[in-house]
C-alpha cells in the first residue's frame, strides 16, 4: 500500500510503500495478548517472598502436652494458623518468564503494526532529527502534529538531539528499530515511524 510521508514540520515529503504482509493483516487480539503477556511476565521482577514455617523466628518446641489439657492438639507455634507463624504456600522468589515461539513473537509484531494502520494511528516521518536538544521546541512540534501520546521508532542509530529533547516529554517514547515491540506499540496512541524504520521492517520480514 502507498502511504504519505511527512516532515516534522507537517509538510508532504512524498510516499512510501508499505508491505501488506507487515501492515495489511487482519489484527488478532489473541496473538497480541499472548505476546504482551509474555513481555510483561519476562519483565516482572519476581522478588516477592514470604517466610514459611521453617523460616520464621519462633521456637520449634511443642506448645503444651498432647493430652489432658482439654485443648486442641498443637505442635509448634510456627504453624500458619498462629499469629507470627509461617505463611502456608506463600510467594517465593522466582522467575515469571515463560516460553513463546519466535514465530508467534514475529507474528505479534506484524499484527500490532497492522492494528495501528487499521486504526489510522500510524504516521511516517522522513527523518527524526532535531536541530537542537530543546524539549520545549520539540514539544511544540509534537503539539502541532497532534502527537500527545506517541511511540517514535527511528533507524538503527537515533539522532542524539531528538532523543534528548523527547525523553522528558510525558507520554512520548523514542526507540531505535531494534527496540520495537508489541507492548510499547499498543500502549501508545500513535505510532510514528521514520523512513529508515520502515525500510528496516521491510528488510526484517521479507
Swiss-Prot record:
One of the Pfam families matching this protein, by short name: Ribosomal_L4
Molecular function GO labels: rRNA binding; structural constituent of ribosome
Region described as Disordered: 63-97
InterPro entries on file: Ribosomal_uL4, Ribosomal_uL4-like, Ribosomal_uL4_dom_sf
GO annotation, biological process: translation
GO cellular component: ribonucleoprotein complex; ribosome
Basic residues composition bias: residue spans: 64-77
Keyword terms, alphabetized: Ribonucleoprotein, Ribosomal protein, RNA-binding, rRNA-binding
Domain of life: Bacteria
Span of the signal peptide: none
Its job: One of the primary rRNA binding proteins, this protein initially binds near the 5'-end of the 23S rRNA. It is important during the early stages of 50S assembly. It makes multiple contacts with different domains of the 23S rRNA in the assembled 50S subunit and ribosome. Forms part of the polypeptide exit tunnel.
Family, as annotated: Belongs to the universal ribosomal protein uL4 family.
Subunit note: Part of the 50S ribosomal subunit.
Record protein name field: Large ribosomal subunit protein uL4
Species assigned in the record: Rhizobium johnstonii (strain DSM 114642 / LMG 32736 / 3841)
Gene: rplD
Amino acid at each position: 500500500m502507498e502511504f504519505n510521508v511527512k516532515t516534522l514540520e507537517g509538510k508532504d515529503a512524498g510516499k512510501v510503500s508499505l508491505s501488506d504482509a507487515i501492515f495489511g493483516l487482519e489484527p488478532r487480539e489473541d496473538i497480541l495478548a499472548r505476546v504482551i503477556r509474555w513481555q510483561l511476565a519476562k519483565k516482572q521482577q519476581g522478588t516477592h517472598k514470604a517466610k514459611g514455617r521453617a523460616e520464621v523466628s519462633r521456637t520449634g518446641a511443642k506448645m503444651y502436652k498432647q493430652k489432658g489439657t482439654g485443648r486442641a492438639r498443637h505442635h509448634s507455634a510456627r504453624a500458619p494458623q498462629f499469629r507470627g507463624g509461617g505463611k502456608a504456600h506463600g510467594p517465593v522468589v522466582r522467575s515469571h518468564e515463560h516460553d513463546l515461539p519466535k514465530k508467534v513473537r514475529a507474528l505479534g509484531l506484524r499484527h500490532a503494526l497492522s492494528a495501528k494502520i487499521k486504526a489510522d494511528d500510524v504516521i511516517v516521518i522522513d527523518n527524526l532529527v532535531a536541530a537542537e536538544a530543546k524539549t520545549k521546541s520539540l514539544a511544540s512540534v509534537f503539539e502541532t502534529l497532534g502527537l500527545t501520546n506517541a511511540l517514535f521508532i527511528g533507524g538503527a542509530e537515533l539522532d542524539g538531539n531528538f532523543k534528548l529533547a523527547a525523553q522528558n516529554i510525558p507520554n512520548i517514547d523514542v526507540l531505535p528499530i531494534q527496540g520495537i515491540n508489541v507492548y510499547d506499540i499498543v500502549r501508545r496512541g500513535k505510532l510514528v515511524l521514520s523512513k529508515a524504520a520502515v525500510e528496516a521492517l521491510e528488510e526484517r520480514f521479507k
